[in-house]
Regions:
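His/Asp/Glu-enriched, well-ordered alpha-helical/loop segment
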Residues: 97-104, 146-176
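Glycine-enriched alpha-helix->loop->beta-strand junction motifs that scaffold or abut catalytic
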Residues: 59-68, 100-103, 120-129, 150-155
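Catalytic beta/alpha-barrel core
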Residues: 104-114, 131-137
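Short, acidic/turn-prone active-site loops that include or flank metal/cofactor-
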Residues: 5-10, 75, 132-136, 161-163
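Metal-coordinating catalytic core of metallo-dependent amide/deamination hydrolases
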Residues: 1-111
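Acidic-and-aromatic substrate-binding clefts and catalytic sites of carbohydrate-active enzymes
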Residues: 49-50, 136-138
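Divalent metal-coordination and catalytic microenvironments
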Residues: 42, 72, 107, 121, ...
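Histidine/acidic-residue-rich catalytic or RNA/ligand-binding cores of hydrolases
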Residues: 77-89, 117-122, 139-148, 165-176
């Protein structure tokens, strides 16, 4: 199993501050670090809910601990358009600038990709989690899974979460 250690910039039932997200997440990672069947990943939610400062810390930790970074990225056209308007850059470009586009990255969704972004994923060793049912429910487009695969990107199947997937059924994802 892979347990994602959530990181987000606002309070939830799990943590009240950015530092608490990191502290609690790293405590979970330490608890399971020698378990052969349980891995951990840093799981910043998405570019629009995590600051550059947090992403910089995430990059350092992922490198130091040699653990993946699980990130919802290019989930919808709206996310990409909002980011371009607010920051002047596509979310993927922001992640490149922050040093997160590398072989630690598991990019979830990736429905809005350019050819150059696909090539960059392949070159960097990024993995993509394709969440077909969630993307259908959100009407957000599809990950170009076959183009990614042909480019040499590792493409996996994902479900996303309960808010955007009615059953979290991996076999259903395979049929979609």
């Amino acid at each position: 199993a892979m347990v994602g250690l959530p990181i987000i910039e606002f309070p939830t039932a799990w943590a009240k501050s950015r530092d608490e997200y990191f502290d609690k997440g790293l405590a979970v990672r330490d608890e399971f670090r020698f378990e052969a069947l349980v891995g951990t990943s840093l799981a910043p939610h998405a570019p629009y809910t995590v600051s550059d400062a947090s992403f910089e810390r995430i990059r350092v930790l992922a490198d130091q601990l040699d653990i993946p970074v699980h990130l919802h990225l290019h989930e919808t056209l709206q996310e990409v358009e909002d980011a371009k308007r607010e920051t002047g850059a596509r979310p993927f470009a922001r992640m490149q600038k922050l040093g997160l586009v590398n072989d630690h990255l598991i990019a979830v969704h990736m429905t809005q990709l350019t050819d150059s972004e696909i090539a960059a994923c392949a070159e960097a060793g990024v993995s993509v989690a394709h969440c077909a049912e969630s993307n259908l429910k959100l009407a957000s487009g599809f990950s170009p899974a076959e183009r990614l695969r042909r480019a040499g990107v590792n493409v996996a199947i994902g479900t996303d979460g309960c808010a955007s997937n009615n059953d979290l059924d991996m076999f259903g994802e395979l049929r979609t």
